[in-house]
Regions:
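Histidine- and acidic-residue-rich, metal-dependent catalytic cores
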Residues: 1-187
Length: 187
């Protein structure tokens, strides 16, 4: 949110929205929420209602901004209109929802589920980078610039078999940090 240029109040509120974005899952039956297999189409239709349920839970909370409430309601909307619950597109999707969406997708990809193994952080970033029709590109870039896949000082194996040490992360090339070859001494 900071990378996107939001002010202190907005950063605070997007944090609240992020914490509350799945509150509507409290209204989804446990047998669906905790199912150890992939959901059926009927079960998924019920699960997709969690964002509406969350909005309804928060609707009467006068101390929460409309941006927080819309972030909860719209966090599964996609820029191309193929999201839910309303199928809205582009700038019709609240900024908070667009911000939450990228983080929510990353979390879903790297988290183990009973029906799937987690993806590596690198694979998750690659998948997110391919979602240019679904996600707000500016929000995606801000998220990717904030993700540190390879902490400085970490040793990694390069594709040529050499071992190298991460010396710098490159903001616009999150998958290609600067490295120092440990045997060659070259950056």
């Amino acid at each position: 949110a900071r990378k996107y240029g939001l002010d202190d109040r907005q950063v605070y509120e997007i944090g609240i929205a992020g914490l509350l974005h799945d509150i509507g899952k409290s209204k989804v039956p446990n047998e669906i929420l905790n199912k150890a297999a992939r959901l059926t189409d009927e079960e998924f239709a019920i699960m997709k209602q969690h964002s509406v349920y969350g909005y309804r839970i928060l609707q009467s909370k006068e101390d929460l901004s409309m941006e927080i409430k819309l972030g909860v309601l719209q966090h599964h909307e996609k820029m191309n209109g193929k999201g839910y619950p309303m199928g809205i597109t582009g700038d019709k999707i609240d900024l908070f929802a667009r911000l939450i969406s990228v983080s929510d997708i990353y979390d879903a990809l790297v988290t183990e589920r009973p029906y799937k193994k987690p993806f590596s952080p690198r694979d998750a970033v690659e998948m997110i980078m391919s979602m240019t029709e679904e996600l707000d590109i500016t929000v995606m870039r801000c998220f990717l610039e904030s993700v540190i896949l390879y902490p400085v000082g970490t040793d990694v194996a390069l594709s040529n078999g050499e071992t190298a040490r991460i010396v710098e992360n490159v903001p616009n090339a999150v998958l290609r940090p600067k490295v120092l070859g440990l045997t060659t001494g070259k950056v």
